[in-house]
Regions:
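Intrinsic-disorder/low-complexity loop/linker signature
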Residues: 8-14, 63, 71
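Short aromatic-glycine-(Arg/Gly/Cys) micro-motifs in beta-strand/loop hairpins
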Residues: 1-12, 26-30
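Small-residue helix-packing motif on alpha-helices
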Residues: 23-25, 46
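A short, exposed loop/beta-hairpin motif centered on an aromatic-Gly-Thr core
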Residues: 9-22, 36
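Hydrophobic beta-strand residues in large extracellular and virion-surface proteins
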Residues: 2-4, 15-17, 23, 74-76
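Short, mixed-charge low-complexity intrinsically disordered segments
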Residues: 32-79
Length: 79
Protein backbone atom coordinates (compact mmCIF):
# COMPACT_ATOMS: atom_id res chain seq x y z
CA UNK A 1 0.00 0.00 0.00
CA UNK A 2 1.21 3.49 -0.85
CA UNK A 3 0.14 6.66 0.89
CA UNK A 4 0.30 10.26 -0.27
CA UNK A 5 0.11 12.97 2.35
CA UNK A 6 0.51 16.67 1.89
CA UNK A 7 -0.75 20.20 2.24
CA UNK A 8 -2.34 22.40 -0.40
CA UNK A 9 -2.81 25.79 1.28
CA UNK A 10 -5.59 25.10 3.82
CA UNK A 11 -6.40 21.64 2.44
CA UNK A 12 -4.81 18.54 3.93
CA UNK A 13 -4.20 15.80 1.38
CA UNK A 14 -4.22 12.13 2.31
CA UNK A 15 -4.75 9.33 -0.21
CA UNK A 16 -4.12 5.61 -0.03
CA UNK A 17 -3.13 3.87 -3.25
CA UNK A 18 -2.87 0.15 -3.88
CA UNK A 19 -0.38 0.31 -6.74
CA UNK A 20 2.64 2.46 -7.55
CA UNK A 21 1.13 3.55 -10.87
CA UNK A 22 -1.96 4.92 -9.15
CA UNK A 23 0.14 6.62 -6.49
CA UNK A 24 2.24 8.32 -9.17
CA UNK A 25 -0.93 9.45 -10.96
CA UNK A 26 -2.36 11.03 -7.81
CA UNK A 27 0.99 12.62 -7.02
CA UNK A 28 1.25 14.10 -10.53
CA UNK A 29 -2.32 15.41 -10.43
CA UNK A 30 -1.50 17.34 -7.27
CA UNK A 31 1.75 18.68 -8.76
CA UNK A 32 -0.11 19.80 -11.89
CA UNK A 33 -2.68 21.51 -9.69
CA UNK A 34 0.14 23.26 -7.84
CA UNK A 35 1.63 24.47 -11.13
CA UNK A 36 -1.43 26.68 -11.60
CA UNK A 37 -0.45 28.55 -8.44
CA UNK A 38 3.32 28.70 -8.86
CA UNK A 39 4.73 30.90 -11.63
CA UNK A 40 8.26 29.53 -11.55
CA UNK A 41 7.24 25.86 -11.83
CA UNK A 42 7.00 24.44 -15.36
CA UNK A 43 5.67 21.32 -17.05
CA UNK A 44 9.27 20.23 -17.54
CA UNK A 45 9.76 20.38 -13.77
CA UNK A 46 6.66 18.22 -13.32
CA UNK A 47 7.95 15.63 -15.80
CA UNK A 48 11.31 15.51 -14.01
CA UNK A 49 9.48 15.07 -10.72
CA UNK A 50 7.37 12.22 -12.15
CA UNK A 51 10.55 10.43 -13.24
CA UNK A 52 12.07 10.88 -9.78
CA UNK A 53 8.91 9.65 -8.05
CA UNK A 54 8.54 6.60 -10.29
CA UNK A 55 12.21 5.74 -9.76
CA UNK A 56 11.67 6.00 -6.01
CA UNK A 57 8.57 3.82 -6.12
CA UNK A 58 10.14 1.07 -8.15
CA UNK A 59 13.40 1.01 -6.20
CA UNK A 60 11.62 1.41 -2.84
CA UNK A 61 13.52 4.65 -2.25
CA UNK A 62 10.63 6.05 -0.26
CA UNK A 63 9.42 8.25 1.33
CA UNK A 64 9.72 10.79 -1.43
CA UNK A 65 9.13 14.41 -0.43
CA UNK A 66 8.26 17.20 -2.83
CA UNK A 67 7.68 20.85 -1.96
CA UNK A 68 6.37 23.45 -4.39
CA UNK A 69 6.09 26.28 -1.87
CA UNK A 70 5.83 26.56 1.91
CA UNK A 71 2.06 26.09 1.56
CA UNK A 72 2.17 23.24 -0.95
CA UNK A 73 3.98 19.95 -0.37
CA UNK A 74 3.49 16.24 -0.94
CA UNK A 75 5.08 13.10 0.40
CA UNK A 76 4.77 9.62 -1.09
CA UNK A 77 5.32 6.69 1.30
CA UNK A 78 5.14 2.92 1.17
CA UNK A 79 3.31 1.40 4.12
Amino acid sequence: MYKIIGKFYDEDIERECATPDYAIGVFMAQIQRGMQYTDNYTASDAIDEAIDVSRGVYTNDLPHFHQLTDDMWLELRKE
